[in-house]
UniProtKB/Swiss-Prot annotation:
Keywords: Cell membrane, Membrane, Transmembrane, Transmembrane helix. It comes from the Archaea. This is Uncharacterized protein AF_2041. The keyword Cell membrane applies. Pfam families: DUF4386. It is found in: Cell membrane.
Amino acid sequence: MSVLAIIFLLNLKPTIYSIVGIFLIIILDVTVAVALYFLLRPVSKNISMLMSLFRIVYAAIFTTALYKIHDLTAFYSILDLGYIFFGIHLFLLGFLVYKSGYMPKWLGALIFIASTGYIIDPLLRFSGYAVEIGMYTFFGEVLFAFWLVIKGRKLSEVVSTP
């Protein structure tokens, strides 16, 4: 094997790991979408379904963006479109959490605030502005994940009702 071939393979390995990691994230996104549907179905079956579909569409757009990974401008443009769908998912998730009665209202409000960053940032980038508000609005999303890990086990009685 030539030295150039070895260098090529060594440089390719991190790229392959990155792509595999991204596909795992996409699979987890779809899994989370389904789990959130069942978790929030008691609040509103239709809105819960719509919320989950927006997350699945985001995952599909993310997958599509991978085909443009060689062209970073196109990749990020496609990803920005996906972020808008993810933001709408968070908007609906925040609404459902707020209305649930079995999750804290403040958490729903923070998720709603997080949705604004995912919706507004890409729209501003498409308009030519480089403003990042998402780096300040993501806390609701992170706190929701922690809340589910810490308190979510106790929700099994609520979710088990069809």
